[in-house]
């Protein structure tokens, strides 16, 4: 038998990349050789290459829901990306392709279909993103995180697996996390995560509320690339990062409370780590509303407190954080009783079942 090979894809934001990494150790254990296809300048490249995974670059256009002159040129980039992906896949001859979505995945999935290579996609949110909606007809199966998602995946292709969570997240050290942030551990640690690309409204609101929050909490703020406020860099008890990767398990372990966007990967990691959290989902003005649905599901199950972006003010933020701390045991109890499991094993089973065998 030839060595098993899998090509992975997904990008545009960390949420379309890091879940792939959760699968890597188990895939290697099963004997898979792993390669990745992404864009030259995408966030996926820096994340994947740090893991010493072979990276292949293609062209791809962004999928926009708004009017932009690039909407006329980007389809040609996608077409170029399809031809580039076909060339790569014919050369690499993988047994299967795994897609985590994002605009870079579209040409890869279409190319795999043309090359008659099985494709397994994963959808994190309740409703499929635009890239996955385009890709579903070319997929063999689509792994879903939420039970509600199955109704939104056409062709009876959906399989409920849960979301893959990186094993290293469970191996963080609180002491190391405090050291990384320069905190003493005397105050509760409040962690703010605005997504890998950052959130201006969350960043601005947190900083406007700093004078009140910092009296009660040590604050670690992951604010997105280019969003560090140098004027606040020496403020005691307030540590800023544009993005963290290897340090994340330690910093998350040190966190007592978390403010986060409501992307599915992020919230399921918070659930797995049993972190009391305040979710601020992207508004419908700047998204398809998927984060609002995710947040509503978690709020309904008692895992999260939710504030809508349109309602967010510094005063309300402070009130909600204080309330979250006072009710933290209630949220931990709900999370501890959750039936949701790490999706790694389930997804690996799907990949192994549908891989193309070669003699």
Swiss-Prot record:
Pathway: Cell wall biogenesis; peptidoglycan biosynthesis. Pfam families: Glyco_tran_28_C (PF04101), Glyco_transf_28 (PF03033). It is an enzyme of class 2 (transferase). Keywords: Cell cycle, Cell division, Cell membrane, Cell shape, Cell wall biogenesis/degradation, Glycosyltransferase, Membrane, Peptidoglycan synthesis, Transferase. One of its GO terms (cellular component) is plasma membrane. GO terms for molecular function: UDP-N-acetyl-D-glucosamine:N-acetylmuramoyl-L-alanyl-D-glutamyl-meso-2,6-diaminopimelyl-D-alanyl-D-alanine-diphosphoundecaprenol 4-beta-N-acetylglucosaminlytransferase activity; undecaprenyldiphospho-muramoylpentapeptide beta-N-acetylglucosaminyltransferase activity. It comes from Clostridium acetobutylicum (strain ATCC 824 / DSM 792 / JCM 1419 / IAM 19013 / LMG 5710 / NBRC 13948 / NRRL B-527 / VKM B-1787 / 2291 / W). Gene3D superfamilies: Glycogen Phosphorylase B. The keyword Metal-binding does not apply. This is UDP-N-acetylglucosamine--N-acetylmuramyl-(pentapeptide) pyrophosphoryl-undecaprenol N-acetylglucosamine transferase. Its EC number is 2.4.1.227. The keyword Glycosyltransferase applies. UDP-N-acetyl-alpha-D-glucosamine binds at residues 13-15, 166, 196, 291. Its main location: membrane. It is a peripheral membrane protein. Cell wall formation. Catalyzes the transfer of a GlcNAc subunit on undecaprenyl-pyrophosphoryl-MurNAc-pentapeptide (lipid intermediate I) to form undecaprenyl-pyrophosphoryl-MurNAc-(pentapeptide)GlcNAc (lipid intermediate II). It catalyses: di-trans,octa-cis-undecaprenyl diphospho-N-acetyl-alpha-D-muramoyl-L-alanyl-D-glutamyl-meso-2,6-diaminopimeloyl-D-alanyl-D-alanine + UDP-N-acetyl-alpha-D-glucosamine = di-trans,octa-cis-undecaprenyl diphospho-[N-acetyl-alpha-D-glucosaminyl-(1->4)]-N-acetyl-alpha-D-muramoyl-L-alanyl-D-glutamyl-meso-2,6-diaminopimeloyl-D-alanyl-D-alanine + UDP + H(+). Belongs to the glycosyltransferase 28 family. MurG subfamily. GO terms for biological process: carbohydrate metabolic process; cell division; cell wall organization; lipid glycosylation; peptidoglycan biosynthetic process; regulation of cell shape. It is found in: Cell membrane. CDD domains: GT28_MurG (cd03785). InterPro entries: GlcNAc_MurG, Glyco_trans_28_C, GlycoTrans_28_N.
